[in-house]
Amino acid sequence: MPDRVLTAAEARQNLLAARGGCIGHFEVVDLMGLEDESIVDRWRDHRQIVSVRDDAGQWVFPVWQFVRKHKRIMLGIRDCLAELPFESELEPLIFFLNGMETLGGHSPLDCLRSGKIEAAIKAARQYGWRKGT
């Protein structure tokens, strides 16, 4: 029996659930130890954090972008986001989570986690060029 093709809704849910899933606004505030809740909104508005609306229309944030121990966003996330096109809210998730030939089959997130920040930023730049940005 051939593999079933995912619907758009299923693919979206898979992206949101990948690598630990997503957390809401207040969980980000708590995780990061922020005193000012509006910081998360500013980060989102200025594309300094990966965010997407859930099925209820609420902003959620993939947990994989946070370094819990140090209460910060993973190094390189913001730099990559600055290079990426935003044709859809899911574009950054697709970029960070999928393996890329230029990264030896690894995902940009894998590169960031292993300290290969410049490689991930270069991949974001190339991804943007391919998209025509």
Feature locations, PLM:
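Non-transmembrane "mature" sequence context
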Residues: M1-T133
